[in-house]
Amino acid sequence: MATSYGFFSPSVPSSLNNKISPSLGINGSGFCSHLGISKRVFCSSIEASEKHAAAGVSSSESRVSRLVNRGCKLVGCGSAVPKLQISNDDLSKFVETSDEWIATRTGIRQRHVLSGKDSLVDLAAEAARNALQMANVNPDDIDLILMCTSTPEDLFGSAPQVQRALGCSRTPLSYDITAACSGFMLGLVSAACHVRGGGFKNVLVIGADALSRFVDWTDRGTCILFGDAAGAVVVQACDSEEDGMFAFDLHSDGGGGRHLNASLLNDETDAAIGNNGAVTGFPPKRPSYSCINMNGKEVFRFAVRCVPQSIEAALQKAGLTSSNIDWLLLHQANQRIIDAVATRLEVPSERVLSNLANYGNTSAASIPLALDEAVRSGKVKPGNIIATSGFGAGLTWGSSIIRWG
């Protein structure tokens, strides 16, 4: 498995070959290197293979050549949303707001919300089936499932339940990734590392969240923003010449977590009793979390400052500029953020993907949801280069330069 040093990107579109030097190296920050294959590749499985090669194992038997020459590409996408739609006019019936007020400040017109009978696992499984169908991959051929969510329906994770719903008979490894609105981006990078360093062939990456369950529906500052959805992509191993994952850039800043969170609630009564010398805290009480708390102004400043920097860093590692990309695909948080980032990157509006108006902020689902809609509508075509970025609570943010198909 690839370590925290990241993955490499051996190839680029043929149309860009004159502008970019293909690379296979890995540098310490986890990005592409244009210096060729480094003398040491930071994958334990590869290092072990090098020892075997030194001992006389033939190159055809060596795992080094298989992994170093291995790329990965996105071959299928899918999405699913709940049937229940909540419009801005619906919200205006129980909070002091209006369609004009919400749309002007966020770009959102409606959102989809899970009802009491709905399951996030079912929604994720539906999105996954759609992605597998497009990729022409059978559930039994899945090697790994990554469920990117901050709202699992089981404390220990929902990925195994998605695996069960899909009927994967080979019991592939399935686990959750929790990184809020950046979750899908981390899942995509993790999938690439698993393919390149771990020998996996078909990895299913799902972004699914039901933030409606953690929203204070009396707070017009947050309840207007969020919707529920699921999106998925199939990441598949390929030859290095077909590689579609060029570079990535990932960050987190715990100091900014106070601006966007849903924290564990403390019992102030117990704390007061403890100050009087009594034994408290046992047996532990059932935990509960606050609703989503957000300082909108600070989150906006964070996004418009850090996201362009992250995308530019990823582009630089890939040997590209913003003029080389076909599409800019950001986490669908707020249209003002999307527009501001596009302006800073000098990407024209006609090359920006946005479906925020119809779904709201769907957290980890937003990027694959928008991608699926753009692919199925014919807007995004095979071979298109996409600069994509997720950002949110933590604070976490990250970008990746990918090729579709």
Swiss-Prot record:
- List the EC numbers from the record: 2.3.1.180
Q: Which UniProt keywords apply?
A: Chloroplast, Fatty acid biosynthesis, Fatty acid metabolism, Lipid biosynthesis, Lipid metabolism, Plastid, Transferase, Transit peptide
Q: Which GO terms describe its cellular component?
A: chloroplast
**GO terms, molecular function:** 3-oxoacyl-[acyl-carrier-protein] synthase activity; beta-ketoacyl-acyl-carrier-protein synthase III activity
Task: Say where the protein is mainly found.
Answer: plastid
**Which Pfam family, any one, appears in the UniProt record?**
ACP_syn_III
User: Biological process GO terms, please?
Assistant: fatty acid biosynthetic process
Active site positions, chain numbering? C181, H331, N361
What is the main EC category here?
Answer: transferase
Q: Which reaction does it catalyse?
A: malonyl-[ACP] + acetyl-CoA + H(+) = 3-oxobutanoyl-[ACP] + CO2 + CoA
Is the keyword Nucleotide-binding in the record?
no
Subcellular locations according to the entry: Plastid, Chloroplast
Report activity regulation: No inhibition by the antibiotic cerulenin.
What tissue specificity does the UniProt entry give? Expressed in both leaf and root.
Name the pathway it acts in: Lipid metabolism; fatty acid biosynthesis
What is the superkingdom listed in this entry's lineage? Answer: Eukaryota
InterPro entries linked to this entry? ACP_syn_III_C, ACP_syn_III_N, FabH, Thiolase-like
Function of this protein?
A: Catalyzes the condensation reaction of fatty acid synthesis by the addition to an acyl acceptor of two carbons from malonyl-ACP. KAS III catalyzes the first condensation reaction which initiates fatty acid synthesis and may therefore play a role in governing the total rate of fatty acid production. Possesses both acetoacetyl-ACP synthase and acetyl transacylase activities.
Protein family per UniProt: Belongs to the thiolase-like superfamily. FabH family.
Q: What is this protein called?
A: Beta-ketoacyl-[acyl-carrier-protein] synthase III, chloroplastic
